Amino acid sequence: RLRPPYVDDVQHYQRLLARHARVELIEVREDDKVAARIPERAYTCLLDAEGTAYDSVAFSRFLEERRMSGMDLCFVIGGPYGLELPGATHAISLGPMTLPHQLARVVLLEQLYRGHKILAGEPYHN
């Protein structure tokens, strides 16, 4: 469960993202139930320290490529002990440091918002 102080930040970025993308946050407590909640036609990105690290501009290009493919984009953040997800299409790293999974959610949402602002040519990214 998401706890303060992260709740306010998550809600803030969900509101900001609403005009750019459909965002649905789903919490699953048990690792074995994660795969069942991923849409069938989804491009699934597992957040993993060993994944691809993007700067914000490259991440915005990644988002645009996924949008053009017509597939749903699904990001999966594991719990405190990580997550094995054999069906994941791609792995993304938010950086080399370990983050609490609740903070990782905030960072991911902020980067999604930043990426959409970059794609729209709107001021935010600097």
Predicted regions and their residues:
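Rossmann-fold NAD(P)-binding glycine/threonine-rich loop
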Residues: 78
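Structured adenosyl-cofactor binding patch, chiefly the S-adenosyl-L-methionine
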Residues: 81, 85-126
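S-adenosyl-L-methionine/SAH cofactor-binding core of RNA-modifying enzymes
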Residues: 20-74
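Short, glycine/charged-enriched secondary-structure capping and boundary segments
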Residues: 8-13, 58-62, 88-91, 106-107
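N-terminal beta1-alpha1 ligand-phosphate binding loop
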Residues: 1-17
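Conserved short hydrophobic interaction patches
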Residues: 13-16, 62, 66, 115
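Short histidine/acidic/glycine/proline-rich micro-motifs that form metal-
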Residues: 1-4, 50, 98
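Residues at secondary-structure transition points
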Residues: 8, 54-57, 98-103
